[in-house]
Regions:
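Substrate-binding pocket helix/loop in short-chain dehydrogenase/reductase
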Residues: 103-122, 126-131, 233
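Active-site helix of classical SDR
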Residues: 145, 180
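Residue(s) in the substrate-gating loop at a strand-loop-helix junction
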Residues: 164
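Short, small/polar-rich loop/turn modules that mediate ligand/substrate recognition or access, typified
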Residues: 196, 201, 263-265
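C-terminal substrate-recognition "lid" of short-chain dehydrogenase/reductases
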Residues: 241-271, 276
Length: 281
C-alpha cells in the first residue's frame, strides 16, 4: 500500500481489534508496512484471515486471531497466544465497534402525534439494542485495553481508540452510538492520565463519514444512487465528499510514533473533512 509517510515500527508488536472491517484493515496494513508485527483480532476469523493474507503476500508480518472483545477470558487467551508468537504488545488499536438498528429512531425530530404513529421514536428504543451498542463500543474498548495495556506497563506503549465525529455533536437517529462514541473520547482522556506515569500514551481518532459495508444501506439506495441522508451528510461536510479509508493512516502513524508524538497523549484527532467544524451556515 502507499503510505503518506513512514515511521519506523521495526521490533514493535501491534494488535488491531475489529481488523476485518474496512477502516481498521487499512490501519493494520499500514502498521505492518512500517515494520510492525501485526496481530489482527476479529470475531469472524475468515474476515481477519483474509486481511492477514493480504499483508503477508506483500512480505510483511501478520497473523489473524479469532476473538470477541466482550469476552475477557477469551481476550486473555488471545493475548497469550500473540505474546508467544510475536512478543508483548507495543501498540493497541481498539477498532471494534458498531451500531444496532434497534437502538435507532426512525425520524430526526419527534413531532406531535408520533406517540400514536407507526414509527419508532425515542420511546420505542430497544433496551437490549442500546445496551448492545454501549457494550460493543465502550466495553469492547475497555476489555482489550485491560488485557493488552497490562503488557505495556513495564515498557510503555501506545493505545489508539477509535471514536467518531458523533463524540463532538451527536447525529440524529443514532442516540446510542453517538453516546457510546462520546464515552470513548472521554475514556481516552481518562486512560491517558491514568497511565501517564508508566509511559503508555492513549489517544483517539474520530473518523467522519466513510462509506463502508456497515453503513452502506444508510448511504446508498439499491440502485447505487445516494440516499437523502447521504445528500444531507455531504452538504454538511465542507470537503463535499466521503473519506477514504487510507486517509486515516496519517493520523494513526503520527500518534503511534514516539519520536513524533512522544509528548502527545489524551487527544482525539477528527479526520472528518471539516464536518465537526461546520455550523451549517
Amino acid at each position: 500500500m502507499k503510505l503518506p509517510f513512514t515511521v519506523d515500527l521495526n521490533g514493535k508488536v501491534a494488535v488491531v481489534t475489529g481488523a476485518g472491517g474496512v477502516l481498521c484493515s487499512e490501519m493494520a496494513k499500514a502498521l505492518a508496512a512500517c515494520g510492525a508485527k501485526v496481530a489482527l483480532v476479529g470475531r469472524t476469523y475468515a474476515n481477519v484471515a483474509a486481511v492477514a493474507d493480504e499483508i503477508t503476500a506483500e512480505g510483511f508480518v501478520a497473523k489473524a486471531y479469532a476473538g470477541n472483545v466482550l469476552d475477557r477470558a477469551g481476550m486473555e487467551a488471545v493475548a497469550a497466544e500473540i505474546e508467544s508468537e510475536f512478543g508483548k504488545c507495543d501498540i493497541l488499536v481498539n477498532g471494534a465497534g458498531g451500531n444496532n438498528a434497534k437502538a435507532n429512531t426512525d425520524k430526526e425530530y419527534y413531532e406531535p402525534g408520533d406517540i400514536d404513529a407507526e414509527t419508532k421514536s425515542f420511546f420505542d428504543l430497544d433496551n437490549d439494542g442500546v445496551q448492545g451498542v454501549f457494550n460493543l463500543n465502550f466495553i469492547g474498548t475497555l476489555i482489550p485495553t485491560q488485557v493488552f495495556a497490562k503488557q505495556m506497563v513495564e515498557k510503555g506503549g501506545s493505545v489508539i481508540n477509535i471514536s467518531s465525529m458523533n463524540a463532538y455533536t451527536p447525529l440524529t437517529k443514532i442516540p446510542a452510538y453517538s453516546g457510546a462514541k462520546a464515552a470513548i473520547s472521554n475514556f481516552t482522556q481518562w486512560l491517558a492520565v491514568h497511565f501517564s506515569h508508566v509511559g503508555i500514551r492513549v489517544n483517539g481518532i474520530a473518523p467522519g463519514f466513510f462509506s463502508t459495508k456497515q453503513n452502506a444501506a444508510l448511504l446508498w439506495n439499491a440502485d447505487g444512487t445516494p440516499t437523502a441522508r447521504t445528500e444531507k451528510i455531504l452538504r454538511a461536510t465542507p470537503t463535499g465528499r466521503f473519506g477514504a479509508a487510507d486517509e486515516l493512516i496519517g493520523a494513526l502513524l503520527y500518534l503511534v510514533c514516539d519520536e513524533a508524538a512522544g509528548f502527545v497523549t489524551g487527544i482525539t484527532i477528527p479526520v472528518d473533512g471539516g464536518f465537526s467544524a461546520y455550523s451549517g451556515v
